[in-house]
């Protein structure tokens, strides 16, 4: 059975609903705005994280590429066989010339200088090519290329030379009077034109 309410009842009902709806409008609005702000912050943080990840990945790839290129360049340099003048022999990035004659220390320096080169100095690679040839150190603790001598000897009237009896033997640095004549080897560097590998050791086996 349908009930008929007086008009005042409906007016009170509408007033109640209007008053209560106004009470919740502000909290609901604040909640919506807060949700929008939080969502925006999350998206911003996600964007920054992805960007940093891509940047770090790019930097890592770039660093790896640079390191690899540097390693390749170093390997190529260390194994470089260069173009040398006629009668000179390429050996690990330097040109070597064995004159086949025995000379004193000072005479050896002069002969190499006339050829636009230096007398072979003391280094691990260069020592591998030595058998009984002058390497420097005239009255001082410095080699002919001005590097400090690491050996413990203190020559007064002697000069240093490299010697070994075979290719497999570790080269030794000894001293003898500078006037003693020994085989001379000059060196120069010219990395302009790579060429084919050749062996320096065979001359002294």
UniProtKB/Swiss-Prot annotation:
Keywords carried by this UniProt record: Lectin
tRNA processing recorded as keyword: no
C-type lectin domain: residues covered: 84-187
GO molecular function: carbohydrate binding
InterPro entries registered for this protein in UniProt: C-type_lectin-like/link_sf, CTDL_fold
Domain of life of the source: Viruses
Protein name: Putative C-type lectin protein FPV001/FPV260
Upper classification of the organism: Viruses, Varidnaviria, Bamfordvirae, Nucleocytoviricota, Pokkesviricetes
């Amino acid at each position: 059975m349908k009930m008929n309410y007086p008009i005042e009842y409906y007016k009170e009902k509408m007033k109640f609903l209007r008053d209560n709806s106004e009470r919740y409008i502000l909290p609901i609005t604040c909640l919506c705005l807060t949700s929008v702000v939080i969502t925006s912050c999350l998206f911003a943080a996600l964007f920054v994280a992805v960007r940093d990840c891509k940047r770090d990945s790019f930097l890592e790839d770039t660093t790896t590429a640079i390191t690899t290129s540097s390693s390749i360049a170093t390997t190529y340099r260390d194994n470089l066989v260069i173009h040398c003048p006629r009668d000179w022999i390429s050996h690990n990035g330097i040109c070597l010339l064995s004159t086949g004659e025995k000379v004193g220390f000072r005479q050896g320096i002069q002969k190499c200088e006339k050829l636009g080169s230096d007398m072979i100095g003391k280094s691990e690679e260069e020592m591998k090519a030595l058998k009984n040839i002058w390497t420097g150190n005239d009255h001082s603790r410095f080699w002919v290329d001005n590097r400090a001598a690491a050996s413990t000897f203190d020559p007064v009237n002697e000069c240093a030379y490299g010697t070994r009896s075979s290719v497999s033997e570790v080269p030794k640095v000894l001293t003898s009077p500078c006037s003693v004549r020994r085989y001379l080897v000059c060196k120069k560097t010219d990395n302009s034109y790579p060429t084919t590998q050749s062996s320096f050791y065979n001359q002294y086996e």
